[in-house]
């Protein structure tokens, strides 16, 4: 029996605002517990929320970037439930009329492109955080309570764990490029809820779905879904029935574990939020936001390939983040060769950032200085080997590469009039190497070049050295 898989993803993205969705409390990651709150977050009687217009605008920005239809007149709803991290006993969200509907993203898996539909996007407030400690007590931190979120709900178009991974990566890139969110799973600004069901091919109705929790990375999402897919198939093949469950991914055991069985759908008793007015979105507001959106990563990738001849893989790496993409474009705008700029960013720059665990904006390197160094290589002022010394300087200090090269005497020696006497001296002292080369031992030329580079402290231009060396050997 063959099966088909259906996967649904609900992605919560934390919007990058200075204050919360319905209160003036600050939004700052990593602060002491319960220091970023006020009476609205705590749900004190008589206090009234107010809508953060900036947060809603960021939500519209995300919706437009995902090709969604923006709802022109909507309202907020109360989702009623009790939990320690929700002191109001309800969450303000959008149920009946979400911010946007009918969006889509295009993914690519194994060279094949596919559109994944987005059913809806809605803006809501986040809950606080329960912390279970070793002393036997559970504590509540409400710093996160009220943080603005946009929830992105996929249509049932995802049919494999690989597609789910590609969808999340594409979604992360698109949202990150808008600037609406940092979308960092490690900081909680992007969280994923998943559900999966399988059914025999040809069956009209969907199978029974299970939810999977504790998915803290895209790799965990992919691996957890892959395990659950096989588990459900095995249950059906053995004649059993899949139960509606919530399961937890164990990354060490590489399996999902039962948390609880769900007997029916949750009843949150939604009703319109009485303390907030409706939200009217004008066409001008939508148009202004649309005009402010940057070129999306997919279009940038294609432009890099077509306009600058960047290989497809490299173009994909350069557009992983808007910061890297903008830096690359700015470097080229400063006159650097596009392929050389790409190579340096993907190689030495990325290597340094990964080794130091920092981001591009946290180092001293500027597009102008990187372009300046690439020009010095291109015109022969410095060698590729010297460039690595220059790079270490300009990525750690705000240093002009041209000025620094001249101050340190690192200019490449390319003048034949200065190189020829040095080469002649080396040849005079190494007749055996000349004889070996003429006898067909090509490695002898490498020895001679090495001696010349040693004599010039690595500053001789290897290309010019080889030209003079071959000419001099022929005359001997």
From Swiss-Prot:
GO biological process: glutaminyl-tRNAGln biosynthesis via transamidation; translation
First-level EC class: ligase
Molecular function terms from GO: asparaginyl-tRNA synthase (glutamine-hydrolyzing) activity; ATP binding; glutaminyl-tRNA synthase (glutamine-hydrolyzing) activity
Pfam families tied to this protein: GatB_N, GatB_Yqey
The entry's keywords: ATP-binding, Ligase, Nucleotide-binding, Protein biosynthesis
Gene3D superfamilies: 1.10.10.410, GatB domain, N-terminal subdomain
Catalytic reaction(s) noted: L-glutamyl-tRNA(Gln) + L-glutamine + ATP + H2O = L-glutaminyl-tRNA(Gln) + L-glutamate + ADP + phosphate + H(+); L-aspartyl-tRNA(Asn) + L-glutamine + ATP + H2O = L-asparaginyl-tRNA(Asn) + L-glutamate + ADP + phosphate + 2 H(+)
UniProt-listed SMART domains: GatB_Yqey (SM00845)
Keyword Nucleotide-binding: yes
Record EC number: 6.3.5.-
Source species, domain of life: Bacteria
Function, as annotated: Allows the formation of correctly charged Asn-tRNA(Asn) or Gln-tRNA(Gln) through the transamidation of misacylated Asp-tRNA(Asn) or Glu-tRNA(Gln) in organisms which lack either or both of asparaginyl-tRNA or glutaminyl-tRNA synthetases. The reaction takes place in the presence of glutamine and ATP through an activated phospho-Asp-tRNA(Asn) or phospho-Glu-tRNA(Gln).
PANTHER family linked to this entry: GLUTAMYL-TRNA GLN AMIDOTRANSFERASE SUBUNIT B MITOCHONDRIAL AND PROKARYOTIC PET112-RELATED (PTHR11659), GLUTAMYL-TRNA(GLN) AMIDOTRANSFERASE SUBUNIT B, MITOCHONDRIAL (PTHR11659:SF0)
Subunit-level organization: Heterotrimer of A, B and C subunits.
Family according to the record: Belongs to the GatB/GatE family. GatB subfamily.
Protein name: Aspartyl/glutamyl-tRNA(Asn/Gln) amidotransferase subunit B
């Amino acid at each position: 029996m063959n099966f088909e898989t259906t996967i649904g993803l609900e992605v919560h993205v934390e919007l990058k605002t200075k204050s919360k969705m319905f209160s003036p409390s600050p939004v700052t990651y990593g602060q002491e517990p319960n220091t970023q709150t006020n009476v609205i977050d705590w749900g004190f009687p008589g206090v009234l929320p107010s809508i953060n217009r900036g947060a809603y605008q960021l939500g519209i920005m995300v919706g437009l970037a995902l090709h969604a239809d923006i709802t022109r007149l909507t309202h907020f709803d109360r989702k009623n439930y009790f939990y320690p991290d929700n002191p109001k006993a309800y969450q303000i969200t959008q149920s009946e009329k979400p911010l946007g509907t009918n969006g889509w993203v295009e993914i690519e898996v194994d060279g094949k492109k596919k559109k994944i539909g987005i059913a809806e996007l809605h803006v809501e407030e986040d809950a606080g955080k329960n912390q279970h400690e070793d002393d036997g007590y559970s504590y509540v931190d409400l710093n996160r309570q009220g943080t603005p979120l946009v929830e992105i709900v996929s249509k049932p178009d995802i049919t494999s764990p690989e597609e789910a991974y590609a969808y999340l990566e594409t979604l992360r890139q698109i949202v990150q490029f808008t600037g609406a969110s940092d979308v960092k799973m490690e900081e909680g600004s992007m969280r994923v809820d998943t559900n999966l069901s399988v059914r025999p091919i040809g069956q009209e109705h969907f199978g029974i779905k299970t939810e999977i929790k504790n998915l803290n990375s895209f790799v965990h999402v992919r691996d957890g879904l892959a395990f659950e897919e096989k588990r459900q198939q095995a249950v059906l093949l053995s004649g059993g029935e899949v139960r509606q469950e919530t399961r937890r991914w164990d990354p060490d055991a590489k399996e999902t574990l039962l948390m609880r069985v769900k007997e029916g759908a949750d009843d949150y008793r939604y009703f319109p939020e009485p303390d907030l007015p409706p939200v009217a979105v004008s066409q001008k507001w939508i148009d202004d936001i649309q005009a402010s959106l940057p070129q999306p990563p997919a279009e940038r990738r294609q432009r890099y390939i077509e306009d600058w001849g960047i290989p497809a893989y490299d173009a994909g790496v350069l557009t992983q983040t808007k910061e890297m993409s903008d830096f690359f474009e700015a470097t080229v705008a400063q006159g650097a060769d596009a392929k050389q700029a790409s190579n340096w960013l993907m190689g030495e720059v990325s290597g340094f950032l990964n080794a130091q665990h920092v981001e591009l904006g946290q180092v001293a390197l500027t597009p102008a200085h990187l372009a300046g160094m690439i020009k010095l290589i291109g015109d022969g002022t410095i060698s590729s080997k010297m460039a690595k010394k220059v790079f270490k300087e300009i990525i750690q200090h705000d240093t002009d590469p041209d000025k620094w090269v001249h101050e340190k005497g690192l200019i490449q020696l390319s003048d034949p009039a200065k190189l020829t006497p040095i080469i002649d001296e080396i040849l005079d002292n190494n007749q055996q190497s000349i004889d070996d080369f003429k006898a067909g031992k090509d490695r002898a030329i490498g020895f001679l070049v090495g001696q010349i580079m040693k004599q010039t402290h690595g500053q001789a231009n290897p290309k010019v050295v080889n030209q003079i060396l071959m000419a001099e050997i022929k005359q001997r």
